[in-house]
Amino acid sequence: WTYVPRFNRNVLMISQGGQQWFDTAYYSGVAATAWSWNVRFLDADLDGDDDMLVTNGFAFDTMDMDASLRIKSAQQSGSKDARALYEMKKLQPRYNSPNMLFRNEGRLRFTDVGEEFGFAHDGITYGLGVADFDNDGDLDLVTNNLNESPSLYRNTSQEPRIQVRLPGGVGSKVRLVGQGGTTTREIVSGGGYLSSDSGEVVFAAGVAGQSEMLVVEWRDGTKPTRIERPVVNSIYTVIKPSLARLLVRGEVTKTTPMFRELPDAISFRHFPNLAKDFDENPLLFKRFSTAAPAMLCRDFDNNGRLDFGFQLARSAGVQVFLNLDGDNFRSVTSRYNDPSGLMGNAGWLDGFAVIEGKPNFVGALNKTIPAIESLTQPAALTLRGDMDGDGTADAIYITQNTLNDHPAESRAMVFLNQSGSFRRAVDWEQSLGALGQVTSAVLVDMDEDGDTDLLVSRDLGAIGLYHNRGDRFVDVSEAFGMLEFVGLWQGLAVGDFDNDGRVDFAAGNLGRNSPMELYPDGLVHLGRGGKSRLSLYAIKRGSVHLPVDDMDLYANVVDRARLPAMYRQFSDIDLAKVLDSFDGLRRTRLNCFETSVFLNRGGKFERRALPYPAQFSPTSGINVADFDNDGREDLLLSQNLYSLRPDWGRLDSSAGMILLGQGDGRFEPVRAGVSGLAILGDSRNALVVDFNRDGRTDIVATQTFGQTQVYLGQAGKP
């Protein structure tokens, strides 16, 4: 079943170098600006950063659902001639909306200061032109308002500036080189709705220290014009030199990217077992039937090279790709299916899955655990580690949350290895209890006492830590300061990110570039599993839970008689008056959406959000490796989410994110044009390993509905 995403919002496309552009509108705070027509970037306050101006309004509020119902009723009962249709159109109210000016706060964040700056006319504004009408060196504005006089806005900023005019210079670039860096602007013409600008560019001259040079790079290749030591608060008109002075362009120096793709090296494409998720519950945040494929890495044919295996959908077996020479792979499909779910991601430090390869791997890829072969509920995760300290690998089997029981709790089943025979350990299971909606888990010695502890990430919850006491687990999440961060946590990966000898971990989350950013006061999830399951979000204001979604969506999951007759009334309704058994719903207030690292401070964890480019897209999987061979641990984030509700579109502003560790708990993001990664699909997990044995870490990344991508490491010296 296919649900087509819709994009009823603004986008802000940020260049990543090369041919990649990512949308950050939610993160930047500009996704919703009413009915908008024109957008301009200019440095309104002359602080060195471009601000954003938006004109708004429309003659008819076509989104007024109450008016649409009145029109529909009139169409069914009245005349359909042109005059009658015009009169019906007048049933839609005028949509006056204030214009908006967003101040650039840095790091791609914007704040609406239209009222403060005097650009908040409440009406219907279509055209927007920019020019220096009073010749004072800054840029002024003119707008065209429907059924009103135009508006003229004078820029009253007193900050120092330098203006440059290039007659006939459309497409040329002007650079101001200063002590603090270089600012670049391009001469553009048109591009606005019913509007054009005069073509001047203005630089803030008091930000980067003394201005050292103006450089004009002409569009047609004419040799650049340079002006040494430009005078502040001056207007420069630069005439293009003779075409005889053409610049002969040399070769562009290209740096070697960190990774090189091997196209079609592994021809595995994942197609999950789809269900009618949104037909079952149209209020779901995302689909649950688009799970990522399980993957593993082992030397299946004992030739000394690491091979790869992927679980096929619908229990069709496992597809194995044999590593022939480090660059080429051969596909072999096993008929083995995985009823016990043992192809879940393993929580080992090396990131390998739990399947144990055998020389005769076709049809026998796994040493199953007999005690759980008969279980019918699929596993989200199967972990292996020595929990009871007897030197043998035990197993934890964690049930997954499915569409039919969301948002029910995950449960763990513990199996102790006793001389090769697995015994179910009920005492261990009872010590864990209900685990929440587990999305990832790791067995690792977090408290350095020599045994394996359990770390879990949760959807609609906080990260949990359970210490191993030798005969049971003890929940120490609150003591370690982890319960205060409630989010949509996904993948986990462990390492020592600050080189203090303690185990730290990284956790994936929704990020800060999603529809959740439209609700700065935060959202509350209301959920109930079982036969009367329900999952929805609400805005909490005092004791009232206000709806986030359209009334029509609620009509699919609650009694229509409980809903008001008018859509406008529904926007202010308390959901407690709509939902059956409201008191039985679990309420979860979300307060943390940032993908983060947690640094172990000995008895406490310090959370640090990863740098802001890592928050542009949801992170489902995380890998730890030294990608640049500098001796410090780096991160690979598997990102993007295509399975949101159709009216919320897709979250796909990542090509796979590399973050280079600095050895002190900090990470520096690598732009896609530098990393060489182009994992543009819905990527949930990856394997990182040196499979061509050149001393550099390579990447194999899966994509839901997409081609598996293979990248060879090229960074640093082996």
Task: State the predicted function of each range.
Residues 7-22, 65-69, 96-111, 149-159, ...:
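Beta-propeller blade repeat segments, especially FG-GAP/WD-type strand-to-loop junctions
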Residues 37-46, 126-134, 291-302, 322, ...:
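Beta-propeller blade termini
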Residues 47-55, 135-144, 302-312, 356-364, ...:
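Acidic/hydrophobic-patterned starts of short beta strands in beta-sheet-rich repeat architectures
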Residues 58, 147, 314, 365-367, ...:
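Residue-level signature of beta-propeller blades and closely related beta-rich strand-turn architectures
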Residues 91-100, 104-294, 371, 422, ...:
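Gly/Ser/Thr/Pro-enriched helix-cap/hinge segments flanking short amphipathic alpha-helices
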Residues 330-354:
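Blade-loop segments of beta-propeller domains
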